From Swiss-Prot:
Subcellular location: Cytoplasm
Annotated protein name in UniProt: Pumilio homolog 9
GO cellular component: cytoplasm
A GO BP entry: regulation of translation
Keyword Cytoplasm among UniProt keywords: yes
InterPro entries: ARM-like, ARM-type_fold, PUM-HD, Pumilio_RNA-bd, Pumilio_RNA-bd_rpt
Annotated PUM-HD domain residues: 222-564
Lineage, uppermost ranks: Eukaryota, Viridiplantae, Streptophyta, Embryophyta, Tracheophyta
Free-text note regarding domains: The pumilio repeats mediate the association with RNA by packing together to form a right-handed superhelix that approximates a half donut. The number as well as the specific sequence of the repeats determine the specificity for target mRNAs.
């Protein structure tokens, strides 16, 4: 407790009015020493009470306004540790052995110090000595501080050794150890330290990998993994096993490890360079989190690596988990990182069972996928990797939603991929549907690319030209469709006479010559036509020679084109 003052003291009137005193004239305890938090003090009068009884007044300035900031000398006091039992608790048992020596030390030290500029009198020194012998709390506290400091000096360079259950928890809350410029070296150092202190516990850390694996396939994996953990496989690399176990100790689980940049790289290396059974262990550890990892910035790489190195049985397990919920699969496909995993899955599936699972998972979300920045690559991967029969579900949907897909930014790319990867009856149906909508598509910012791609594929001109007939002049004056008409002039020789004849019949032909887009159609017609058809076109152009200075007619009236 702090000293407040008593009636008759010369400085009692100067005390602050805002400091409430107890009934006995003393302040509540101001002692915040952490070492006395759980320490019960015996009921006795403290030094201030004794001084008051002797008629000695204390200067209250030491409580109201310290002259300078109080500092603790590190050489005299230690810091209490918070990890388990400290040296403070362990060394209290030796207090009785140096009790007398420390009491003498405290008294001698007080003799050499001034108390606010006044040296203690012999009577006061005797009182202080009695205080030390009567109240053991102050002595035990100082003794504990001294012993604790000595303990810290002895243990400061010793490595921290914790039981396994604490080590796992510390790893989860100490993720900051991987932040900074030297994360790789810290990780490797931790791996070596763990391997050196706890080599006998490697197999016990593999037990979390065995949970939630159902069916005959899961049972066989479980059996193999238990044998791996017990060291029954001669092919199991001890070094690789230690690496995996050490890293799991740091991160807490393989799932958390896969979400870290460094941890994911270590897992990929273990999967790629380790044994077949090590890949099984890692697969079992993440199989319940494969959907989550597929959409993780780092976790997606380990899932892709497992698709590359797994056997057909393991690959079937991963595919079945990813495709079990079509809604979740579509969500993965639309994700920036998940689309890579699904594309890798499509590229590696081989068996009929695996392909059937992929098709059943993707089919419900076809339209959403083709219109998405990430999802459209999944459909294109199917078209480029799977066979014609397996792509039937894609081509059927593309034919059905042809007009809707073709006018979409990403859908037009998918539709072009469908054209190039279709054969036979499927191709004929798709081409017929695109041709039927070609007049509308050729005027669209994205649909015109589909029509142009169809023309480049040497599709029969009859179906397209039927749609364009009587619309050539109109299409020639539009930004997007003018490219389609130019493509027809270049790729379909049989269409040239019909296109030129329709252009020449326009009442206001001079408007075509001055049009920002139609003038390019006229230039292309002059370049590709021959004979009577070209002669009629040149004669028509010469009638409007006065337009040769027009910015859009300069190229048309150039000697190179007209005299070609």
């Amino acid at each position: 407790m702090g000293f407040g003052g008593f009636n008759g003291d010369f400085n009692f009137r100067g005390a602050s009015d805002h400091r409430p005193l107890g009934s006995d004239g003393f302040l509540p305890s101001l002692d915040t020493n952490p070492f006395l938090k759980n320490h019960k003090s015996v009921e006795a009068l403290d030094l201030c009470k004794k001084l008051h009884k002797m008629g000695i007044s204390c200067d209250m300035s030491i409580w109201t306004k310290p002259e300078e900031q109080f500092r603790v000398d590190p050489s005299e006091f230690g810091a209490r540790t918070l990890h388990g039992s400290s040296g403070f608790d362990q060394n209290l048992t030796g207090a009785s052995q140096i009790h007398d020596g420390f009491r003498n030390f405290s008294s001698v030290r007080l003799q050499n110090n001034n108390f606010h500029g006044v040296s203690p009198s012999p009577g006061e020194m005797r009182l202080l000595g009695r205080q030390d012998s009567f109240n053991l709390n102050g002595f035990e506290e100082m003794l504990a501080l001294k012993n604790h400091r000595d303990f810290l000096l002895d243990q400061i360079h010793e490595p921290i050794k914790r039981p396994p259950f604490l080590r796992g928890n510390d790893a989860l809350i100490s993720s900051l150890m991987f932040e900074g410029n030297n994360r790789v070296s810290q990780t490797l150092a931790a791996m070596e330290a763990s391997r050196g202190f706890y080599p006998e516990e490697d197999s016990s850390l593999l037990s979390p990998f065995h949970e939630k694996v159902s069916g005959k396939l899961g049972a066989s994996y479980l059996e193999d993994t238990v044998l791996i953990g017990q060291g029954s496989y001669g092919k199991m690399s001890p070094k690789s096993n230690n690496d995996l176990v050490s890293m799991v100790e740091i991160y807490g689980s393989v799932n958390l490890m896969a979400k870290d940049q460094i941890g994911c790289r270590v897992l990929q290396k273990l999967v790629e360079e380790g044994t077949f059974h090590e890949a099984k262990v890692i697969l079992l550890a993440i199989i319940d989190h494969v959907v989550e990892l597929s959409m993780d910035p780092f976790g997606n790489y380990i899932v892709q690596k497992l698709f590359d190195v797994s056997d057909e049985e393991q690959r079937t397990l991963i595919v079945s988990v990813l495709t079990s919920n079509p809604r979740e699969l579509i969500r993965i496909c639309l994700n920036t990182y998940g689309t890579r995993v699904v594309q890798k899955m499509i590229e590696t599936v081989k068996t009929k069972q695996q392909i059937a699972l992929v098709k059943s998972g993707l089919k419900p979300g076809f339209l959403a996928l083709v219109k998405d920045l990430n999802g459209n690559h999944v459909i294109q991967s199917c078209l480029q990797t799977l066979g014609p029969n397996d792509n039937e579900f894609v081509l059927e949907a593309a034919t059905k939603y042809c007009a809707e897909i073709a006018i979409h930014r990403h859908g037009c790319c998918v539709l072009q991929c469908c054209i190039s990867n279709s054969v036979g009856l499927q191709r004929e149906r798709l081409v017929a549907e695109i041709s039927r909508n070609s007049l509308h598509l050729s005027q669209d910012p994205f649909g015109n690319y589909v029509v142009q791609y169809l023309i480049d594929q040497q599709v029969s001109a009859v179906k397209l030209l039927v749609q364009f007939r009587m619309h050539y002049a109109e299409l020639a004056t539009q930004k997007f469709s003018s490219h389609v008409i130019e493509k027809c002039l270049r790729k379909y020789p049989e269409s040239r006479a019909e296109i030129v004849r329709e252009l020449l019949c326009v009442p206001n032909f001079e408007y075509l010559l001055q049009d920002p887009y139609a003038n390019y159609v006229i230039q292309t017609a002059l370049s590709v036509t021959k004979g009577p058809v070209r002669a009629k076109l040149v004669a028509k152009v010469y009638r409007y020679g006065k337009l040769h200075s027009s910015p859009y007619c300069k190229k048309i009236f150039s000697k190179t084109i007209l005299k070609k």
